[in-house]
Every structure is written in C-alpha cells, then in structure tokens.
Amino acid sequence: MAETKDQNVLNIIIISDAAGDTAFSNATAAAAEFPNAEINYRRYPFITNLEKLDEVLKEIEKYPNLVIIFSLVKDEMQIPVIKFARDHNIQCVDIFSPVVEAIQQTTHMIPDQKIGAQHSLNQKYFDRISAMEFAVMYDDGKDPKGFLEADVVLLGVSRTSKTPLSLFLANKNLKVANLPLVPETHIPKEIYEIDPKKIIGLTNDPSVLNEIRRQRMIAYGLNPDTTYSSMDSINKELESAQALYKKLGCYVINVAHRSIEETAALILEHLGIDDYAK
C-alpha cells in the first residue's frame, strides 16, 4: 500500500455493483464536514463479479490514505473487500448490509440479494447519472461550453467549496459547471451570455479563507505564509470576485461557517426548486 506523510489528502474509493450513487452521496456528505481535507473520489460502478472486483482491489493498492465505501449486495462480493481492508489496515464502510440486516431482523424475511433492486430505472435516475458525469466534465472551468448547457454555474475564488457543491447539486439532478476566479484573468464570454439567475457567486470571510489556505500549505509541507494565503491577496481576490458578481447581477452566498448542505439548500431555494422533488 502506498504511503504519504500528507494525512490531509484522502482517497475515497467507492465500489458498487450498481451506479454507486448512494455510496457517493454518503461519501460527499460526510466529506463536507472536513473542508481542509483534499479529497479524491475514485468510483468503481457496476462491479458485478469477482473478476472485476479483483481488478479494482489491485488497482487501488497504489493509492495512499484510503477509505473504502462499498455498496455490494452479494455476500461473496463483500467478503474480499472486507478482507482487503483488514489486510491493509484501512477503513472500510459497508453502507448497504446494516440496513438490510435491520429490516431482516425486524420482518424475519430473507433478502433476495438482487442487484439494483433499490433503483427504479426511470428517467429521473438516468438524469442523475448524467448530471454527475456533467459535473465532473465541467469542473474548474475545463470547457466553457459547459456554462451554456448548465442548470447552475458556480463562481468563486479558491476554497469556496465549488467542487463539492457541484457534486452535491448533481445528485439533485442538476447539471452544474463551476469556474475558479483569479484576479486579472480572463472570464469566458459564455459567463456573460447566460441567464444571471442561474449564476451563483460564492464568497467567504477573509479570515476563514486565510486559515483554510494556511492549513492547506501546511498539509503540503510548505511555508503557510505565502501570497496565496496572505490577507492582502485574499482581500484582493474577494473584492475582484464581488465586483464581477455585481456586474453580472448574480445571487451571492457567503459559504463561511455553512455546510455544503446548507449552501445547496440556499441555491435550490433561489432557483425555486423543491429539494424533495429531486
């Protein structure tokens, strides 16, 4: 198993015999409680036989600081994952079996271990899969055309929760693109072409950003007192972002001391979307 001194960098492995949406949603919701952690999500969906599972376990051995979250219906698929985690002394979370066991003990019924039984394969389900793929494809302004196709566009300086928010909202069937804001850099013309209502400007308190960025530098073993983490630089970034938000006439949210869920709820309310409808 690969090792690293940087305990703030975490690789969350999601293994599922279906799409893995439930496991992914659990992972992102839990990870939102650790804003200073740099988290890489590695999804392995539709792992339906032992051969595929063995390939996954061999591949993830190279990653450091692992947490495995799995949703596997069949016992024969669960056991190798649990054994792998035990042998490598890593944390492993089964999000499916405890619920099945609780229902079984209460009803005295035997589960049929049918893969995918929990999903209704309707259009809403497939839309959510598509939204997840969209969020990954258009993260960090990778392709400006995504702004025109998105339901929501998130703008914000570094460390304002753009990516976790994108993924959280994608799980609500929303296509989300985001753009990091850096002073004196070009803003894609597409940003000015879209409806301002679907643009969300994210900001933060300078002191909160300062602490987050300092901790990020420390996590990388670097000097925390850099231009990136200086109050002067942070204030300039926030002022530049605020000027853009005013120019666009977009909705602005301060994410300081707010969870991902709280910020997402404000966005859904602004868009007139009932959370439960998604």
Swiss-Prot record:
EC number(s) stated in the UniProt entry for this protein: 2.7.11.32, 2.7.4.27
Query: Keyword set for this entry?
Result: Kinase, Nucleotide-binding, Serine/threonine-protein kinase, Transferase
Q: Which InterPro entries match?
A: Kinase-pyrophosphorylase, P-loop_NTPase, PPDK_reg
Where is ADP annotated to bind? G156, V157, S158, R159, T160, S161, K162, T163
Reaction catalysis annotation: N(tele)-phospho-L-histidyl/L-threonyl-[pyruvate, phosphate dikinase] + ADP = N(tele)-phospho-L-histidyl/O-phospho-L-threonyl-[pyruvate, phosphate dikinase] + AMP + H(+); N(tele)-phospho-L-histidyl/O-phospho-L-threonyl-[pyruvate, phosphate dikinase] + phosphate + H(+) = N(tele)-phospho-L-histidyl/L-threonyl-[pyruvate, phosphate dikinase] + diphosphate
Disulfide connectivity for this sequence is none
Its Gene Ontology molecular function terms? ADP binding; ATP binding; phosphotransferase activity, phosphate group as acceptor; protein serine/threonine kinase activity
Which protein family is it in?
A: Belongs to the pyruvate, phosphate/water dikinase regulatory protein family. PDRP subfamily.
Q: State the function annotated in the UniProt record.
A: Bifunctional serine/threonine kinase and phosphorylase involved in the regulation of the pyruvate, phosphate dikinase (PPDK) by catalyzing its phosphorylation/dephosphorylation.
Q: Which NCBIfam families match?
A: PRK05339.1 (NF003742)
Q: What is this protein called?
A: Putative pyruvate, phosphate dikinase regulatory protein
**Species name for this entry?**
Lactobacillus acidophilus (strain ATCC 700396 / NCK56 / N2 / NCFM)
Specify the taxonomic lineage. Bacteria, Bacillati, Bacillota, Bacilli, Lactobacillales
